[in-house]
């Protein structure tokens, strides 16, 4: 026993405190259990999570999976010393990704990689996971916390989340029924969500020389408060729309409106987005004015061609159609073509739905959405007007 005790102490001195990790995991059991229903079996802390799947209301249940992270939004959490919101961001981002296929969430697992485990940070993250999982009706059934001295800067960590949901096969939303003449609806975002943060930080913190505690121009919020707005969960609203009404859904993450619409468009259809149809939130106007970004209409590039497996800024959004290429953060803020604003940021639209014209008014009312464009015959492109 004395030998084991010495080994644990030596490991802690090397930067990995196993005892602290075990204590923290015991302390968060109450938060985790709040997300559990009768379908979750077994005890917390086992080698795997157990979930009893029963889908009596489905003819042909199909499991839907997604994995994602929060990107460099974490840098704002570090600077603000506030961590619960990025925990919720992670859950909501994953929920939205599977909701885009018509699925409802079943369970979620998290990963935290850190330089050293800090009790207060760990507690805030788990509060964020738990709160968002409860709101989504999703069980938090497992996680991994890895202490890796030398891998991260002091006080920093990385997050990843994996979600599993289910959809009845006849109700899968995959875009195949989209056709020319259909209406495109946009659901409002809550700020940047989890995308474009490398460029936003470059503009706000380096070019404008603001601090996270600085008040944003023409806003009651500080830079940090604005950038830590929580990624919206759209699944509860989408679930209210009658099955078969929505033909296609695009979660507007890394790649913005321009690229994410391409992921659901049939090859013979173009998405025409009328950018004057909604008011772009102030944070994007600030970024555009101060990032040497041209006003829409000053230059007009040809519509971007269809891309299936490329994304901007890593998980500032990863997707599930394949392993997606991540690009490095910009080394300087250059003049950006106006179309790039719609390829980096969500520009105030967090989810897009494609419906037939006859259903548009009904779905707009349910989703509290705006009509932002239409589908026309084409070759699988996004056009910005």
What are these regions (language model features)?
Residues 16, 20, 86, 195, ...:
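A generic structural signal for residues located within well-ordered alpha-helices
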């Amino acid at each position: 026993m004395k030998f084991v005790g010495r080994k644990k102490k030596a490991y802690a001195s090397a930067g990995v405190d196993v005892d602290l990790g075990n204590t923290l995991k015991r302390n968060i059991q109450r938060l985790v259990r709040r997300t559990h229903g009768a379908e979750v079996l077994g005890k917390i802390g086992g080698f795997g999570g157990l979930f009893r799947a029963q889908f009596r209301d489905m003819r042909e249940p199909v499991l839907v999976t997604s994995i994602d992270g929060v990107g460099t939004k974490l840098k704002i959490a570090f600077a603000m010393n506030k961590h619960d919101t990025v925990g919720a961001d992670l859950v909501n981002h994953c929920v939205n990704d599977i909701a885009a296929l018509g699925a409802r969430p079943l369970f979620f697992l998290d990963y935290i990689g850190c330089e050293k485990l800090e009790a207060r940070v760990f507690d805030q993250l788990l509060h964020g996971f738990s709160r968002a999982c409860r709101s989504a009706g999703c069980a938090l059934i497992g996680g991994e916390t890895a202490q890796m001295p030398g891998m991260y800067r002091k006080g920093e960590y990385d997050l990843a989340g994996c979600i599993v949901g289910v959809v009845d096969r006849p109700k899968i939303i995959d875009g195949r029924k989209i056709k020319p003449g259909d209406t495109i609806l946009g659901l409002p975002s809550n700020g940047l969500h989890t995308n474009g943060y490398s460029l936003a930080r470059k503009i706000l913190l380096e070019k404008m020389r603001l601090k996270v505690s600085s008040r944003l121009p023409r806003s009651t919020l500080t830079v940090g408060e604005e950038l830590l707005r929580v990624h919206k969960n759209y699944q509860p609203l989408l679930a209210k729309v009658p099955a078969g009404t929505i033909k296609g859904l695009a979660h507007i993450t890394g790649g913005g409106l321009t690229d994410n619409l391409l992921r659901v468009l049939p090859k013979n259809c173009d998405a025409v987005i009328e950018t004057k149809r909604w008011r772009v939130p102030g944070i994007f106007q600030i970024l555009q004015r101060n990032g040497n970004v041209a006003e829409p209409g000053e230059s007009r590039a040809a519509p971007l061609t269809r891309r299936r497996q490329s994304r901007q800024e890593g998980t500032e959004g990863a997707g599930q159609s394949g392993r997606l290429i991540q690009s490095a953060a910009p080394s300087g803020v250059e003049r950006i073509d106006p179309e790039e604003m719609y390829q980096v940021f969500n520009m105030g639209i967090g989810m897009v739905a494609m419906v037939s014209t006859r259903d548009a008014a009904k779905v707009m009312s349910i989703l509290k959405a705006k009509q932002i464009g239409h589908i026309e015959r084409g070759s699988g492109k996004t056009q910005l007007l």
